[in-house]
Structures are given as structure tokens and as C-alpha cells.
């Protein structure tokens, strides 16, 4: 640089500024693409969470329906003069350890027990903006022109997007953990419902064959 004339130094400064500006534009473009991908992932997780809620509600409804079906079987046994165990069949099933472990004492999942947590920092598909650059700015100004203004703005946006991406990653991790727990709960409910249905089918077959 010592061998360069003032004009050449100025030309080189403008060249570096142009290259730096293009770099910040590319970085901003990549950051926006990453943010868009994150928003789409958040939306998909939200939709998946709603589907899991509907599935779990279906398991709860089957549980309620089976309780009524067991009551009907007990009444039919009485009407047919068949021997009924002293303990109510439904009570016996619902007092079992596996049933209580799955459904709790109430036998139904209250709304508070259904996983409903959704990402909190996304509103209508738009991430909540975080704070931008510090008061000193991101770049050291050389030419002090509109290009450096754009570079500063680009890097400020990148900094904000990176903050949003961090928040989205935390939200996605929490939501995935919650959904994994809900899937495990749904599996347990499905197994318990199947066992309950099998027992009811056996009782119904005995009633038909009697």
C-alpha cells in the first residue's frame, strides 16, 4: 500500500467496499433463507401438534365409550341371569395399575394434561424481532457513503435474524420434546384401550355363547 498513489488507494478502498457490500448481501440472503426454513419447520410442528392432540382426544373418547360398553355388558349379564362377579367389571379394569398409570385416577385426560405448547416467539408466521447491533455499529467506516449504510443495515438484519434463529431452535427443541412425550402417552393409551376392548370382546362372546 505504501507504493500506491492516493488515487490508487482510494480506488482500492472503493473496490473493497463493493466486495464487502456484496458479501453482506449474500450473508443476508442466506440468513433470510434459513429463517424462512425455520418458520416452515415451526409451522409443521404446530400442525403436527394439533394432529397429536386430535389423536389423543380420540383415545380419550374410546376410553369413555368402553366404560359405557362395559356397563351395558354388565346389565346384559344380569338380564340373562348370568353370574356377575361381586366387583363391577369396569371398576376392576380402571382400578388396575396399568390403567391408572396411563389415565390417572380420573380416567380421562384433562385439557391441562394434553400437550398444547406451541412455539411462543412466532406470531402469524413472523418471528419476534430481537435487538440489533450495538450503538457502535457493525462496520468500521472508510468511504462513509450509502454502500456502508447498506452494509450496516444488512448486518443489523443478519444479527436480528440470528437471534430469531436461536429462539426458534430453542422453541423447536422444546416442542419436539413435548411431542415425543405425547406420542409415548398416546401409545400407552392405545395399548390400554386395546386391552380393554379385548376383555370386553371376551365378555360379549361368552354372553352370546351362553
Swiss-Prot record:
It is a peripheral membrane protein; Lipid-anchor. GO terms for biological process: exocytic insertion of neurotransmitter receptor to postsynaptic membrane; exocytosis; histamine secretion by mast cell; membrane fusion; protein-containing complex assembly; regulation of exocytosis; synaptic vesicle fusion to presynaptic active zone membrane; synaptic vesicle priming. It comes from the Eukaryota. Residues 23-76 form a coiled coil. Residues 104-136 are annotated as: Disordered. The keyword Ion transport does not apply. Keywords: Acetylation, Cell membrane, Coiled coil, Cytoplasmic vesicle, Lipoprotein, Membrane, Palmitate, Phosphoprotein, Protein transport, Repeat, Synapse, Synaptosome, Transport. GO terms for molecular function: SNAP receptor activity; syntaxin binding. Its main location: membrane. Residues 14-76, 145-207 form the t-SNARE coiled-coil homology domain. PROSITE patterns: T_SNARE. The modification N-acetylmethionine is found at residue 1. Pfam families: SNAP-25. It is found in: Cell membrane; Synapse, Synaptosome; Cytoplasmic vesicle membrane. The modification Phosphoserine is found at residues 5, 20, 23, 34, 110, 160. A lipid is attached at residues 79-80, 83, 85, 87 (S-palmitoyl cysteine). Essential component of the high affinity receptor for the general membrane fusion machinery and an important regulator of transport vesicle docking and fusion. Belongs to the SNAP-25 family. This is Synaptosomal-associated protein 23. The gene is Snap23.
Amino acid at each position: 500500500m505504501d507504493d500506491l498513489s492516493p488515487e490508487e488507494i482510494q480506488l482500492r478502498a472503493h473496490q473493497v467496499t463493493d466486495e464487502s457490500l456484496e458479501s453482506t448481501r449474500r450473508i443476508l440472503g442466506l440468513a433470510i433463507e434459513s429463517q424462512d426454513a425455520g418458520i416452515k419447520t415451526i409451522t409443521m410442528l404446530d400442525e403436527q401438534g394439533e394432529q397429536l392432540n386430535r389423536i389423543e382426544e380420540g383415545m380419550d373418547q374410546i376410553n369413555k365409550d368402553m366404560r359405557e360398553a362395559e356397563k351395558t355388558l354388565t346389565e346384559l349379564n344380569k338380564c340373562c341371569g348370568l353370574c356377575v362377579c361381586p366387583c363391577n367389571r369396569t371398576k376392576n379394569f380402571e382400578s388396575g395399575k396399568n390403567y391408572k398409570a396411563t389415565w390417572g385416577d380420573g380416567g380421562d385426560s384433562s385439557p391441562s394434561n394434553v400437550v398444547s405448547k406451541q412455539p411462543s416467539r412466532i406470531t402469524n408466521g413472523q418471528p419476534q424481532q430481537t435487538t440489533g447491533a450495538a450503538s457502535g455499529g457493525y462496520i468500521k467506516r472508510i468511504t462513509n457513503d450509502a454502500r456502508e449504510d447498506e452494509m450496516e443495515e444488512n448486518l443489523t438484519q443478519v444479527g436480528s435474524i440470528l437471534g430469531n434463529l436461536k429462539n426458534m431452535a430453542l422453541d423447536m427443541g422444546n416442542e419436539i420434546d413435548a411431542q415425543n412425550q405425547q406420542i409415548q402417552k398416546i401409545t400407552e393409551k392405545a395399548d390400554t384401550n386395546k386391552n380393554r376392548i379385548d376383555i370386553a370382546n371376551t365378555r360379549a362372546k361368552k354372553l352370546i355363547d351362553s
